[in-house]
Amino acid sequence: MTKNIGKITQIISAVVDVKFTNNGKLPEILNALECYNDTRRVVLEVAQHIGDDTVRCIAMDSMEGLVRGVEVIDTGSPIRIPVGTETLGRIMNVVGEPIDGKGDIKSSNISSIYKPAPDFTNQSTERNILVTGIKVIDLLAPYTKGGKIGLFGGAGVGKTVLIMELINNVAKAHGGYTVFAGVGERTREGNDLYHEMIDSGVINLAEPEKSKVALVYGQMNEPPGARARVALSGLTIAESFRDMNEGQDVLFFVDNIFRFTQAGSEVSALLGRIPSAVGYQPTLATDMGELQERITSTKHGSITSVQAIYVPADDLTDPAPATSFAHLDATTVLSRQIAEFGIYPAVDPLDSNSQVLDPMIVGEEHYSVARQVQQVLQTYKSLQDIITILGMDELSEEDKLTVARARKIQRFLSQPFHVAEVFTGAAGKFVNLADTIAGFKGLVEGKYDDLPEAAFYMVGTIDEAIKKAQTLK
């Protein structure tokens, strides 16, 4: 088969025009084109047919050294990347090239990054809880298999540690794999995450096949084309794990979904499209929908997505986060105020919520205990001004009891993490859902009113708190 070869006629920033004259056949929209700058391969993606046998492309890599007249080869298909278990423990870029310096990824399975969402008949409509082993999440903002979770958190509140614990726990409890897509990541943060995963055993360098995670990075310094597509590359690997013969529960992290939108906006502007509200691309809802609709459960397995979301200027009505919210099933909010108390994970129990915290799905007991816990914490929050100004002595006996229970609940919402054992010295705890519900039920009913507050801090189950209380006496 003869290769379809064109030549670069124009380069403007990350946009490249390529003219095909040999046989009059133009590459299809979204096809990957290849050109070489010395020995470096540069991948271009066809975005528009602009007439005169010319296609307009978006570059997936730096354009340094490319000039007009360079030959470009049509690959005949969209961007294709290696998928399957060979990607575990490895870092690749948007076009599937390894960037961890450990040689080629030897996978027999190669897949296009563009796929339709699963057919309606193949999708699973069951809503099953994905038990994470993290008490505060499982009780108050439970995740569903195949659900989409928004993770809101600033710098230094424990977002990375929470992500790694979720990776660790899902792998242990469900035998699942994880895919991490760094979209517009700081290179330093991506590097830190990789080394922390090695230290905590999530990535096994000696035996990569025993690793639990595959990483796909499109860093902040990459062209907008790479940042706009890297989430799709990560999702393609996650889909391959989900659709394996035995079926898998896969965890898919995107950090940061806002940067996916931002990169799409840059690409749109470079292609000369008229912007919509606040300068975003006119196809914002479509781009987001195409990504989010592929994140779903099928009869084989599930992809549960945790998406870090940056909110520009804390404006929740901004089109980028507002478009993301429409797809979310649960929100996990990390609070700096809670982190300052030394309570980790620093999940805000009142701001975090989940659509599946419903008695029809989680059961009457779980729902009732969760709402009682939130009620106690909300009452404590409303009493804090009085406590600050007048002190505890001015409260009624009933309010004093509520405050005491709330402080115990706050501390019991903390727990030691497996991935933090290295620097805390405390053994990590995976807490079953039944133990979580039983522990908090006892707390709100007053069964443990006689135990000291300190007994509930950084323990797993309520039995551990009772044992700890005996050592404190």
Curated annotation (Swiss-Prot):
It is a peripheral membrane protein. Produces ATP from ADP in the presence of a proton gradient across the membrane. The catalytic sites are hosted primarily by the beta subunits. It catalyses: ATP + H2O + 4 H(+)(in) = ADP + phosphate + 5 H(+)(out). GO terms for cellular component: plasma membrane; proton-transporting ATP synthase complex. PANTHER family: ATP SYNTHASE, ATP SYNTHASE SUBUNIT BETA, MITOCHONDRIAL. The gene is atpD. Its EC number is 7.1.2.2. It comes from Rickettsia rickettsii (strain Sheila Smith). Keywords: ATP synthesis, ATP-binding, Cell inner membrane, Cell membrane, CF(1), Hydrogen ion transport, Ion transport, Membrane, Nucleotide-binding, Translocase, Transport. This is ATP synthase subunit beta. It holds the Pfam family ATP-synt_VA_C.
